[in-house]
Amino acid sequence: MLGAFFLILVLFLISQGLFSSLAKKHAFFSRKLMNQLFWYHIVFLGIYYSYTIFNRSDSKAYFDRPQRQGWNWFDFFGTSTTFIDFLSYPFINFLGFNYEMMMVLFAWMGYLGFVYAYLFFRENIPVKITVFKNFDLLTLILFFPNMHFWTASLGKGAPIFLGLMMFA
């Protein structure tokens, strides 16, 4: 568990470097908003992790399968759900990540999907739409809880969302 907290801090710092680069390229980029979104997403990581303690979750299988004896990394390469095992294999077997650390890593992938979604929509819809007399619609949409829940865990949601938003 301690490794997961350390990884959260490391990924937060890496995010700051990414934000510096993005802020140079995009005048509209808001580091403050992205930092708030980071911690909001981490809250959903905690919620999803709590959910997995008391309920069945695919994330447990995605953590267990890459540790099978007699399987190597490229045995998991493919276009099915085994691709998630392929992505997680080096972190579990070479870097020694535990379940909680894998949850954090994939939650960060999901978070990066939100960063790229923000860039995509802010670039392509430059008009700020205000709702409820006070709130920017894009900001409000970024904080909808459903996508945060499903992209804050070891699973398909985070890498799919990241990939979609990176190449949108």
Identify the function of each model-found stretch:
Residues S153-K156:
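Short acidic/glycine- and proline-prone juxtamembrane loop motifs at membrane-interface regions
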Residues Y51-R65, F74-L87, G96-F97:
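Extracytoplasmic catalytic/substrate-binding loops of multi-pass membrane glycan-assembly enzymes
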Residues F143, F149-T151:
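Membrane-embedded catalytic interface detector for glycan/lipid assembly enzymes
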Residues F28-K32, A117-F143:
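Transmembrane-helix signature of polytopic, membrane-embedded enzymes
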Residues G17-L22, V104-P126:
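Transmembrane-helix motifs of polytopic, lipid-linked glycan transferases
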Residues M1-V43:
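Start-transfer (signal-anchor) and selected internal transmembrane alpha helices
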Residues L22-A27, Y51, N55-R56, L95, ...:
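Membrane-interfacial segments
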Residues V10, I92, G96, M103-A117, ...:
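Transmembrane alpha-helices of multi-pass, membrane-embedded glycan-processing enzymes
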